[in-house]
Design a protein with these regions (language model features):
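Amphipathic alpha-helical scaffolding segments comprising HEAT/armadillo-like alpha-solenoid repeats
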Residues: 1-10, 29-43, 64-76, 96-108, ...
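Alpha-solenoid helical repeat architecture
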Residues: 10-14, 42-46, 59, 75-79, ...
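Structural detector for internal amphipathic alpha-helices that build alpha-solenoid repeat scaffolds
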Residues: 17-29, 40, 50-64, 73, ...
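Extended amphipathic alpha-helical coiled-coil/heptad-repeat regions
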Residues: 102-105, 109-126
Length: 134
């Protein structure tokens, strides 16, 4: 498939599996176009959080900082699994110095989760706390 076809699937499909597959392929085929689309989708509150987590996973380490403001500055609460994915990517992908400015916002978002939600991502949060000395 060519990049245009993959982009059409991402934008027009109602099938989340097809959208995810197309996003992964587009990230491998034409990364710069994928990044534009990913940033667009990450800014939208109504986009499925699992799809947003997949987009984050496809973004290369050098660009993860471009993603964080899209997610952390919106008013809608971030689902626990998406917040866990953000923490995971910050620990393994971002340089520690660059990621530090997002720590207070991530910690604040974590504190707003319910006890069950916190428990579901506790492992990521504990690693995150240890790495950033919270």
């Amino acid at each position: 498939m060519i990049a245009t076809e993959l982009e059409n699937i991402i934008r027009n499909s109602n099938d989340l599996d097809s959208m995810q597959e197309a996003a992964v392929k587009l990230s491998e085929l034409q990364y710069s176009r994928f990044l534009e689309i990913a940033l667009e989708y990450l800014e939208q509150d109504e986009v499925d959080a699992y799809f947003q987590a997949l987009l984050i996973d496809c973004i290369v380490p050098a660009d993860i900082e471009r993603v964080l403001p899209c997610l952390l500055h919106r008013e809608k609460p971030i689902e626990a699994y998406l917040l866990g994915d953000i923490m995971k990517n910050m620990m393994y992908l971002s340089p520690q110095d660059n990621a530090r400015k997002y720590i207070p916002e991530i910690n604040e978002r974590y504190q707003k989760l319910t006890d069950n939600e916190k428990e579901s991502i506790r492992e990521y949060y504990e690693e995150f706390k240890n790495q950033y000395s919270l």
